[in-house]
Amino acid sequence: TSKTKKEAALYLLKSYYYKAEFALQDEEEKKQIFNKGKSLGEEYINKHPDSAEFRYWYLVNLGSWAQVYGILTAAREGVSDLMKIHSEKIIELDPEYRNGGGYFMLGAVHYKSPYIPFLLSWPNNDEAIKYLQLSVETGKAEINQKNYLAQAVNKDGQHEKARKLLNEVINTKPNLNN
């Protein structure tokens, strides 16, 4: 059935990410797997444009793809713009998905993307803080959300707030259901 195919594709998309991110050491192998995740995500976003989950897991793969390929390749491919567009769409479709996952992705892309005049002029740490704070306040705050927020507020000079957030991260009990 199409529901079964959709579930299998989503599971495969997640599996590509976890395999490349946590099971592989070789950069070339990681690139191959993230390429598969990127392609599968694009295919299923086209098939299911109103799916927050396909967009989210596409962005997870795309963000990791950008890390293994490097900042210049990612900039040439327009990764930051893609991440911004799809994050905004996730927020529009389901702001609660993955405990504010759309807000998290939008905040993370503002935080991690370099400001490049004439090419990438929208990344902004104030916007990163705004969206990362929204992600922490939506649903159950996740460790990764707090970690990114701590980095963004630290960059902004809010060192005490960053320290407080990082202490919360350190003292978080592991979630065995994740």
Feature map (PLM): residue ranges:
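N-terminal alpha-helical scaffold/docking segments in eukaryotic complex subunits
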Residues: 1, 7-8
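Alpha-helix initiation/capping motif
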Residues: 70, 94, 124, 141-142
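Accessory, usually C-terminal, subdomains that scaffold auxiliary metal cofactors
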Residues: 141-143, 147-150, 162-166, 170-173
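An amphipathic alpha-helical core segment
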Residues: 133-140, 146-156
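Short coil/linker segments at helix-helix boundaries
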Residues: 2, 12-50, 56-89, 101-135, ...
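Ligand-binding pocket scaffold of soluble enzyme catalytic domains
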Residues: 93-96, 100, 144-145, 149-152, ...
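Helix-start (N-cap) detector for alpha-helical repeat units in TPR-like alpha-solenoids
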Residues: 6-7, 52-53, 98-100, 142-144
